[in-house]
Design a protein with these regions (language model features):
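Hydrophobic anchor at the beta1->P-loop junction of P-loop NTPases
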Residues: 25
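Short regulatory helix/loop adjacent to the ATP-binding pocket of P-loop NTPases
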Residues: 108-123, 140
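N-terminal pre-Walker A segment at the start of P-loop NTPase domains
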Residues: 1-14
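Hydrophobic positions on the alpha1 helix immediately C-terminal to the Walker A/P-loop
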Residues: 36
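Accessory nucleic acid-recognition modules appended to NTPase machines
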Residues: 161-327
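Conserved nucleotide-sensing/catalytic segment adjacent to the nucleotide-binding pocket
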Residues: 59-101
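Conserved lysine of the Walker
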Residues: 33
Length: 387
C-alpha cells in the first residue's frame, strides 16, 4: 500500500491485539476501517460481507465459514451478519489462540452490543476520518478553506477522489442504504431536510422541539432521527461539563458533524472560496477543532473526556478536555488576526469551574504562535501539541 496514510490509532490497536482475541473497528462509511485492518493484519484471511456469495455462506453455515482457516480472519461489514458474533465467542472461548478482526460501517445494534457479546474477548475501537496530524505532509494545511471544504476522508486526502464528487455519492449511499434499508425511515425528503438543518446548527445547542417545528415532525421523531445520525457516525453530540461547578448550567449538548467537508456539502457550499463569504465558516472551523480533540481520544483507545462549558449567565468555553483529573481549556477562533478579546473566557474560567486547569489555549488560523505565556496561542495545524 504505497499510498497508505498511517493512522494514529495503529499503535493502540496493535497493543490491544496482544491481549484480545478479537479486534473490532467501527466508524462511518469510508473512514478507512478496512484499509487499516488490512494494513495491521496482512496475514489474516479477509472476507467482505458486501460480497453476497460470502454473506450467504456466512448466514447459512456460520461454523464452516469461521473455520475455513486456523489463522486469523478479518471480516469486513460484520453488521450484515450479526449472528456470527455468538459463533466467534464460542470459537475464542474454546481456542483463545484464534484471532479475528471485525469492521462495521455503523454503530447500530450489532456494534453497540459487540463489547457485551464478546466481553473480555474484544478490543473495540472507533475510527473517524483523518486527523490534521495524520495528513500533515499529505495535504496543503496552509489553505484552511480548502481543508474545511474537502474534509478529511481518506480517499480525498489520498487524492483518490475530490469533494464535489465524493460527498453527493456519500450522502446518496447513506440515505439509500443506512436510512432506508437499515433504519426503515420512509420519509427521505423530510429526513434530508432534517440533515441539512442539522448542518446549519453546527456548534449550537440541540433543541428537538425547535428543529421538529422547522421540519414538520414531532420532537420525538427528531430525537429518533438524531440517534440515527449518531448511530451512523454522521454527527457527534458534545456534552456540557458539569463537575465541580456551583453555577446553573446548560444541560443540552452541542451538535457537530464528524467531518467538515460533509457539513459544507449539506450547507450547499460549492467552492472553498465561498467559505470566505459564508456566515457558517467560524462554526465549521470550530467543528473541525472539536473533532480533532475527539479523534485524539479515540486514537488512544479512550472514550468521552471532551466537553464544552456554558452556564445560565452565557459564560462559555468552546472546548474542555479532561485528562488525569485536570482540564485543558480551549477557545476556538477562525480569525487569522489575534485579538485580546479571545482570552476573556480563559482568564475567568477558574471562577466558573473548580476542576484544576492545566492548560489554556486559543486555537486560531493565524501564523503567529506563543506558548510561553499563561494562555497558549496555537495555529490549527499544531492542535495536536495541546491535546
Amino acid at each position: 500500500m504505497t499510498d497508505y496514510i498511517h493512522r494514529k490509532i495503529e499503535e493502540t490497536i496493535l497493543e490491544a491485539s496482544k491481549y484480545f482475541s478479537v479486534i473490532a473497528v467501527s466508524g462511518p462509511r469510508q473512514s478507512g476501517k478496512s484499509t487499516l485492518l488490512t494494513q495491521l493484519f496482512p496475514l489474516y484471511e479477509k472476507y467482505s460481507l458486501k460480497d453476497l456469495n460470502i454473506l450467504d455462506y456466512a448466514k447459512n453455515d456460520p461454523i464452516a465459514f469461521l473455520n475455513q482457516t486456523d489463522e486469523g480472519i478479518f471480516i469486513d461489514e460484520i453488521q450484515r451478519c450479526p449472528q456470527l458474533l455468538d459463533y466467534i465467542q464460542g470459537i475464542v472461548d474454546n481456542n483463545p489462540k484464534r484471532h479475528f478482526a471485525l469492521s462495521g460501517s455503523s454503530n447500530f445494534e450489532v456494534m453497540k452490543n459487540l463489547s457485551e457479546s464478546l466481553a473480555g474477548r474484544a478490543g473495540v475501537f472507533e475510527l473517524l476520518p483523518m486527523s490534521i496530524q495524520e495528513v500533515t505532509g499529505k495535504v496543503d494545511l496552509d489553505n484552511l478553506n480548502q481543508i474545511l471544504y474537502n474534509g478529511l476522508y481518506p480517499s480525498i486526502c489520498a487524492k483518490k477522489n475530490i469533494a464535489k464528487f465524493f460527498y453527493p455519492s456519500y450522502v446518496k449511499t447513506y440515505l439509500e442504504k443506512d436510512v432506508r434499508d437499515l433504519l426503515q425511515i420512509k420519509d427521505q425528503i423530510r429526513f434530508t431536510k432534517f440533515l441539512k438543518l442539522c448542518a446549519a446548527r453546527i456548534g449550537s445547542l440541540f433543541n428537538a422541539t425547535e428543529l421538529g417545528a422547522e421540519v414538520g415532525v414531532s420532537s420525538k421523531t427528531i430525537s429518533h432521527w438524531l440517534s440515527v445520525l449518531q448511530a451512523s457516525y454522521l454527527i457527534t453530540l458534545l456534552p456540557p461539563y458539569y463537575e465541580n461547578i456551583p453555577k446553573r448550567l446548560v444541560k443540552s449538548p452541542k451538535l457537530y458533524f464528524n467531518d467538515p467537508g460533509l457539513a459544507c456539502y449539506l450547507l450547499d457550499i460549492e467552492t472553498p472560496q465561498q467559505l470566505d463569504r459564508d456566515k457558517m465558516r467560524g462554526a465549521i472551523f470550530e467543528n473541525m477543532i472539536v473533532m480533532e480533540a475527539i479523534k485524539h481520544r479515540y486514537n488512544m483507545g479512550l472514550e468521552g473526556g471532551v466537553f464544552f462549558y456554558r452556564d445560565s449567565n452565557q459564560n462559555e468555553v468552546d472546548l474542555l478536555i479532561k485528562q488525569e483529573g485536570e482540564l485543558t481549556a480551549i477557545e476556538v477562533k477562525s480569525s487569522m488576526t489575534y485579538s485580546s478579546s479571545f482570552e476573556k473566557a480563559l482568564t475567568q474560567i477558574e471562577g466558573w469551574i473548580k476542576t484544576p486547569i492545566s492548560t489554556k489555549a486559543i486555537v486560531y488560523s493565524g501564523d503567529f504562535e506563543n506558548t510561553s505565556g499563561n494562555i497558549n496561542l496555537i495555529n490549527y495545524r499544531h492542535i495536536s501539541s495541546i491535546l
